[in-house]
């Protein structure tokens, strides 16, 4: 039991140290993408700089052009939207909601008092 525990703890500790060493090595090199090339961008450029340079080269075809087109769309309010909305007078069976059980109507099992007879 103790031998298994010690071997597990040794494995766990060594794995953590290895992971820590790997993350510190990548953090010390700077940008993770510094060694990669994206469509001819210089190594050391960030992905954002590379995309911006590519967009400028392709006559603004890309993310910025899509955002610009979305922002240039005109949205209009219809007359129906501007009309006064119906309101209730605050009672349980208000003006905008039909009466549930008018006076004199009997409540049956079938209706369950949800609608008038």
Curated annotation (Swiss-Prot):
Pfam family, one: RALF
InterPro entries on file: RALF, RALFL27
One GO term describing the cellular component: apoplast
Propiece residue ranges: 28-71
Any single GO BP term: calcium-mediated signaling
Record's signal peptide: 1-27
Molecular functions (GO terms): hormone activity
UniProt keyword list: Disulfide bond, Glycoprotein, Hormone, Secreted, Signal
Positions annotated with a glycan in the UniProt record: 31
Cellular compartment(s): Secreted
Function: Cell signaling peptide that may regulate plant stress, growth, and development. Mediates a rapid alkalinization of extracellular space by mediating a transient increase in the cytoplasmic Ca(2+) concentration leading to a calcium-dependent signaling events through a cell surface receptor and a concomitant activation of some intracellular mitogen-activated protein kinases.
Family, as annotated: Belongs to the plant rapid alkalinization factor (RALF) family.
Cross-referenced PANTHER family: PROTEIN RALF-LIKE 27 (PTHR39112:SF1), PROTEIN RALF-LIKE 27-RELATED (PTHR39112)
Descriptive protein name: Protein RALF-like 27
Organism field: Arabidopsis thaliana
């Amino acid at each position: 039991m103790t031998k298994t525990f010690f071997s597990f703890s040794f494995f766990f500790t060594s794995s953590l140290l290895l992971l820590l060493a790997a993350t510190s090595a990548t953090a010390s090199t700077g940008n993770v993408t510094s060694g990669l090339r994206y469509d001819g961008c210089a190594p050391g450029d960030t992905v954002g700089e590379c995309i911006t340079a590519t967009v400028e080269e392709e006559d603004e075809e890309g993310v910025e052009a899509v955002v610009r087109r979305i922002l240039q769309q005109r949205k209009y309010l219809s007359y129906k939207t501007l009309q006064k909305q119906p309101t209730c007078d605050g009672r349980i069976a208000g003006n905008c909601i039909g009466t549930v059980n008018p006076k004199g109507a009997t409540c049956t099992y079938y209706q369950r008092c949800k609608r008038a007879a």
